[in-house]
Amino acid sequence: MKTEIRFHEGLKGSGVVVSVTHGDHRLMFDFGAPFRPDTNFYDGVILHRNENTLKDAIRLGETVSVDGIYPEKDLTMFDGSLFRNIQPFEASDMKTAVLISHLHLDHMSNIKHLHEGVPVYMHLHGAELLKALENIDEG
């Protein structure tokens, strides 16, 4: 059985997501959003959405399309099909954990999209800061 190392995002300096997979075990390093100033999808109007945030993030290239880490409810389309045929956490045999190196947005901002069954590890101070940011709606 071979070990696979994959760079999902971050080769241009931000939005780091790297995985190491061996059999049905996967370790992901960081889970951030890339900074892409060259994209021009912002039109000056911000409308807060509570639904489809994962699908929107994948469409915009703000998070990675990876099987087995996202909740089925966030991937299910109106017709019952799965968004881009991404396999949800609930249907996957892959055992995944995410390690966050430090609390910068380009390293951890997308952990909010992960299924609650995916363990996320980070330094205690980073976890405390993340909780404080979530409490003021900035996390």
Predicted regions located by residue number:
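Transmembrane beta-strand segments of Gram-negative outer membrane beta-barrel proteins
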Residues: M1-T3
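Divalent metal-coordination and catalytic microenvironments
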Residues: I5, V20, D30, H102-L103
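Extended recognition/assembly regions associated with phosphoester-bond processing machinery
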Residues: R6-H8, G13
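Residues that form ligand- and interface-recognition hot spots within folded domains
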Residues: E9, L124-G126
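Short beta-strand scaffold segments in enzyme catalytic cores
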Residues: S14-T21
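A short helix->loop->beta-strand "cap" motif at the edges of active sites that frequently abuts
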Residues: H25, E116-P119
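Pre-active-site segment of Zn-dependent metallo-hydrolases
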Residues: H25-L99, G126-G139
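Di-metal (Zn2+ and/or Mg2+/Mn2+) metal-binding site signature of metallo-dependent hydrolases
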Residues: A91-G117, L124
